């Protein structure tokens, strides 16, 4: 079964522009579909809302930076969040702990409990599964017929 071409186009656009501000009005204007239709179709095909997907992918992309960057503010700004407060709010909602606790997790610190470790592992696995699902969804895109120009080549004797 093939994936929906509109949703594939939207996913590709979001993935290319993940660090920019993306809103439903701009998606509607870019793809020439009604906002409500896009939101319903996306949720039906992917299983999460467009904005939930965007936030989850921004957070997912930011996780690897905790090993290298000392400042959570830099991680937030480098992943398309305008403030550390909003980043921390979304991070805790998605990962299950705040960014500081996640840093403890990454550094295998004694300041994170076993329960928090289990929560982090479970939620990071969910993010990974969503990422894999979307990649496979895009691979199942219906092939488009491409115009092939036939060139007439003459033999030179």
Protein language model annotation of sequence segments:
Residues 4, 8, 12:
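Glycine/alanine-rich phosphate-binding loops at beta-alpha junctions
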Residues 11-16, 21, 25, 44-82, ...:
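Terminal helix-turn-helix DNA-binding modules in bacterial transcription factors
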Residues 30, 34-35, 82-84:
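Short coil turns linking two alpha-helices in DNA-binding domains
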